[in-house]
Amino acid sequence: MPITPHIVVQGAGRAAAFYGNAFGAEELDRIPVPDGRLMSVRLRIGGGLLHLADEFPEMGVLAPPSIGGTAVVLALDVADAEAVIAQAVTAGAEVCQPLADTFWGERHGQLEDPFGHRWNVGQHLRDVPHAEVVAAAAIAFAAGPAS
């Protein structure tokens, strides 16, 4: 069963344009409500779907700036992480974690979009046995958080 993220933004129309410029998202449809807000904008990014909605505070539907951040990170598996990150930065995203080769076998970086959502961008480099990933994670996190 597929999973489709629904994310809340301040300005769903602007967000749809941003995701088109940043990640090549294709807008499939949108559902406006009488006051002009968008209940849904359905996008296709690669082989997946993403739904956007404007804030509806009267229903408790709030975007990251209204709640002080986000607890969710969206992930993109791409063929060229450097190109995707460069395109997203040109469109207005900020780099949170610069691209680096990781112990789990990806070239990986993280972005924050102008709407407060975080995106991991990963490019598969090599298969790493699970036991090696677990051992490397233990070493990487042994010292605690980086300061």
Give the label of every model feature segment.
Residues 1-6, 17-112, 123-147:
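Vicinal oxygen chelate
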